[in-house]
């Protein structure tokens, strides 16, 4: 499955440390959350790719991530404050986790619009998207009422599996700033 990090916050200058999600209303079937390890994905890159990516930066954009919402009637007006508060930011494609020291591939399909400079056709970014979304880097969390998931936004992507319609899924989220 594709994991794009639903509320990743990679589009922020200082992304949050982590998130806690509590399942309040859980569908009888479906509605799981997928997690993907960006550090394990980095570990499996060839040495050539690691060296090539080390000096690259990518642009992460709230506007890019919410382009469909912005195109809706009144969307730009509705999200005007969020657009002002979240200008595009540049982050290294390869970041070092501040606690573990492990390197991670710091891109995602939702907010990463492009790599600066050397990737005009998007082939490097598409390679990275395909690489980090491999099943071997993923785990699936199946929710029960009041289950709690905690993850490190600096090294893990997450995405809900939207396969539970017409059932309801209600979560409460706590974001931990770094």
Regions from the language model: what does each represent?
Residues 1-148, 153-178:
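Non-heme Fe(II) oxygenase catalytic core, chiefly the N-lobe of the double-stranded beta-helix
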């Amino acid at each position: 499955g594709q994991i794009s990090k639903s509320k990743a916050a990679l589009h922020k200058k200082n992304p949050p440390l982590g998130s806690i999600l509590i399942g309040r209303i859980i569908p009888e079937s479906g509605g799981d959350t997928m997690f993907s390890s960006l550090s394990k994905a980095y570990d499996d890159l060839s040495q050539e790719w690691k060296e090539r990516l080390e000096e690259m930066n990518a642009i992460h954009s709230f506007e890019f991530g919410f382009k469909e919402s912005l195109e809706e009637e009144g969307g730009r007006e509705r999200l005007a404050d969020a657009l002002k508060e979240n200008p595009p930011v540049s982050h290294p494609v390869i970041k070092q986790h501040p606690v573990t020291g492990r390197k991670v591939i710091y891109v995602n399909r939702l907010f990463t619009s492009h790599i600066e400079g050397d990737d005009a056709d998007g082939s490097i970014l598409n390679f990275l998207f395909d690489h980090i979304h491999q099943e071997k880097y993923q785990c699936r969390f199946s929710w029960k009422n009041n289950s709690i998931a905690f993850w490190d936004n600096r090294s893990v992507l997450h995405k809900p599996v939207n396969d539970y319609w017409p059932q309801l899924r209600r979560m409460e989220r706590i974001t931990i700033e770094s």
